Amino acid sequence: MDRIKIVGGNKLNGVIPISGAKNAALPLMIASLLTDDTLTLENVPHLADVEQLIRILSNHGVDYSVNGRREHQNGPYSRTIHFTARNIVDTTAPYELVSRMRASFWVIGPLLARMGEANVSLPGGCAIGTRPVDLLLDALLALGAEIDIENGYAKAKARNGLVGARYKFPKVSVGATHVMLMAATLAKGETIIENAAREPEVANLADCLNAMGAKISGAGSSTIHVQGVTNLSGARVRIIPDRIEAGTYAMAVAMTGGDVLLEGAQESQLSCVLETLRQAGAEINETNSGLRVVRNGHGIQPVDITTDPFPGFPTDLQAQFMGLMTRAKGTSHITETIFENRFMHVQELARLGAKISLSGQTATVEGVERLKGAQVMATDLRASVSLVIAGLAAEGETIVNRVYHLDRGFERLEEKLSRCGADVKRISG
């Protein structure tokens, strides 16, 4: 099992190209199930979750081909993938595939909309709380689906097709918004989605669906209107830059000090995060090619945050920000409102010398003068990279174990960091 070895103390200087967003790539790939034409996606990141979803789509009969190239010498391996779901051969998504990644459950929406039925295993993924699928299933019920839960599977049918409806989510959910949006494109009549997720990835999906012939307006706001169409066609769509990856590297620079251009990053996707990092002592400016992040001799200042749906502070950057706050000159408070069990990294950060206490959904972080390297273990995707950030500033050697979590969401992380001066190596086996 691979590990990441970090020798801390080096500042980061250089350019880090930001890859395509995993959280946008996955729903756009699933949208290929809605048409028998070819959907071509550009800027697809090379990640374990993407490869797993390709296997799941192939199980349903989706053909695919990959074109890959480096956009420039030090850039990410940008991939264009062509998906063609001309013949859906199976509407069952089995446990052995779906259990490995939660987002794979989203195939239930397109399969139900196009084929009138879907039999999908209840999902797996990061162990950061129960993350129930009730919101998603209730949305499909509102569109006229019949759903039974039997033997760990959601069995859904729409005997006469889905029918548009007005539906308000009781709680904002990105995944449920994705699924309802995809299903509604082929429903009869108009669907109005209220309290919809506003994330940039939702807008990217809507742009993709519109390019395929859907009639969607309002994506990126809390109310989305969908006028159903009889069929969708192929399209060519580019996946947006990964704002979580960009925010992660911005925090790494704030942690170590230095001067890094995050190539392709967009301030509009990260305004809350960037303002928080400015309060913490980083200087951040938008350029024609991305975001430049600088931290010179000034120390890290403590900042309190509360995670919220977009445009608030994203839960997917909470662990990384906690890693940064372990070196702040004072005490900070981090409150998690999205998931009920997303503090599993606290114990591992403590192994590096962090002082963190928990009370309910709030972590109190007392900044320390120094961290010291140690063996630590990744518990989930975002927690794993918080340990990398802490290790970059720790004295001595840090070994991060179980880095398969990292490979689910960060494309060639050790390569990108080492090119900016970090002493980071992958140890195989």
UniProtKB/Swiss-Prot annotation:
Annotated UDP-N-acetyl-alpha-D-glucosamine binding lies at 102, 131-135, 171-174, 316, 338
Enumerate the UniProt keywords alphabetically: Cell cycle, Cell division, Cell shape, Cell wall biogenesis/degradation, Cytoplasm, Peptidoglycan synthesis, Pyruvate, Transferase
Q: Per the record, what are the reactions this protein catalyses?
A: phosphoenolpyruvate + UDP-N-acetyl-alpha-D-glucosamine = UDP-N-acetyl-3-O-(1-carboxyvinyl)-alpha-D-glucosamine + phosphate
Q: In which pathway does it act?
A: Cell wall biogenesis; peptidoglycan biosynthesis
Modified residue 2-(S-cysteinyl)pyruvic acid O-phosphothioketal is at which positions? Answer: 126
The record's subcellular location field reads:
Cytoplasm
* Tree of life domain: Bacteria
Name used for this protein in its record: UDP-N-acetylglucosamine 1-carboxyvinyltransferase
Query: What EC identifiers does the entry list?
Result: 2.5.1.7
Return the broad EC class: transferase
User: What does the entry list under GO cellular component?
Assistant: cytoplasm
What task does this protein carry out? Cell wall formation. Adds enolpyruvyl to UDP-N-acetylglucosamine.
Please classify the protein's predominant subcellular localization into one broad category: cytoplasm
Family, as annotated: Belongs to the EPSP synthase family. MurA subfamily.
Listed disulfide bonds for this chain? none
